[in-house]
Amino acid sequence: MVSLISIVSVVFLLFTTFYHFGEARIINVGGSLDAWKVPESPNHSLNHWAESVRFQVGDALLFKYDSKIDSVLQVTKENYEKCNTQKPLEEHKDGYTTVKLDVSGPYYFISGAPSGNCAKGEKVTVVVQSPNHPKPGPAAVTPTLPPKPSTTPAAPAPAPPTPSPKSSTSTMAPAPAPAKSSAVGLVAGNGIFWASTLVAVIGLAFA
């Protein structure tokens, strides 16, 4: 017979696996399928886009490009800054490249096009947050102090006129007695319940 501990362990493992699959995403580099190219202007650089995205462990980057004239190279930080296409960490030339982000930290990608696309801005740095990295909280809001009250004292209100005493002739009627039907019904219902329970216990004892 399978132990309860084994069943619980398998259920927990399956839950954890499906949870991480649900969190993982496939992200188009640059925000669209045709963004892996020389940017139109510095304001549209791939790094500007990457800074606006929160990358997590398990995500995947999708590069789409013309494999006849371009490629994707994953390089070191030094080669990234120099646009050095020699000895990359990984080289992709299939035109539809998916790169899995398995660990946290920075990833550096440059274009391998011989026309020098990297120097023209076709490169991107992706920083993957650690699983325990806290999410940014909301900006602090400075409380607004209420305006100070006016120091000029207000004039006192005139005293109300004193009403003339009148003799009260009306008498208050006594409150009616509360109804007893609901309480009686509750007591009767409890009596029936306990009587039935007692009969059932006696029947089981002599069965």
Curated annotation (Swiss-Prot):
| Residues where lipid is bound covalently (GPI-anchor amidated serine) | 181
Task: Give start and end of each Phytocyanin domain.
Answer: 25-130
A Gene Ontology term for the protein's cellular component: plasma membrane
Q: Where is the composition biased (Low complexity)?
A: 165-179
Q: Which domain of life is it from?
A: Eukaryota
What residues are glycosylation sites in this protein?
A: 43
Membrane-related topology note: Lipid-anchor; GPI-anchor
Primary location group = membrane
**Residues annotated as region Disordered?**
129-179
Quote the subcellular location field of this record: Cell membrane
Q: Kindly list the cysteine pairs connected by disulfide bridges.
A: 83-118
What is known about what this protein does?
May act as a carbohydrate transporter. Required, together with ENODL11, ENODL12, ENODL13, ENODL14 and ENODL15, for male-female communication and pollen tube reception and burst at the synergid cell surface of the female gametophyte.
Q: What is this protein called?
A: Early nodulin-like protein 11
According to its UniProt entry, this protein's organism is Arabidopsis thaliana
